[in-house]
């Protein structure tokens, strides 16, 4: 039997201890310590980060980050005032690329740069497709207190920030059967075999919807269990009684190498698996009594050919969960609430890199968990 360990490094002090709440596994699973050297700090140009909206590791093992410059706390923006009221800081561009060592490689984007397309009011989700293009979306489903419009779109850019495509647009939702507008879409994945973009359209709608990734032409859509999506107001499921026949916050979507499509039904604490045509395959439920943010935030696949494991972000329990992809079995679980290095506060997303390390995003930071023991890719 093994126990997971995490090294918590802070300033010049470090200690190593057992991670609380670990489920011991009978088979080899990856083990992690915190890499407190990532990213390289301070960030250049006196940059400060707002809320982290999405992260993704590309084919070059680079971490891409999407944050909201407009949500950098005002007290941190003294340098950007006219005249300056402090030595720190200015809001960083919305999209930042880091190498595996944590160095900033390039950065671009933000609402002030949006010309000819609709920048999201409340950013959500980042994905890098097989061509290297960057996809971002937004989760706002109604008019904001500041008058900002609902987010009904996903945007596609080249790696250097050139606008390429907008699917949907601003405006209130017309419902889960409308194919012209999204409603608080949370995430996308692009299938290299068909060049189709699969969208988790889940904060306002209750569906997976598929478009051509170059033209934006609508292809198909489905709801829970592969049935037509509906907008019935259903309570969240706690694992008792019959499972609901509708999604409740479709928060992630990932296409595996074998063609299976994994969908996170966040507030119902489950993953549903489909064929690419929407045919239902399987359902996996995790910590069904979890309320709050739910137990199924997002998944990422282990970087071997078989994609042996998935890492599951459990935001409601502040956990990282390692799952065997073949049958959805939970193999290990670690993590704890807190704001110290190595702890989680509003953990929103977790991603494997090409070496099996894990990046976690939460509020205003990204942490890197370095693989040290157990099975490696």
What are these regions (language model features)?
Residues 1-6:
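N-terminal secretory signal peptides that target proteins for export/translocation
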Residues 7-20:
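Bacterial N-terminal signal peptides
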Residues 24-377:
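Eukaryotic scaffold repeat domains enriched in small/polar residues
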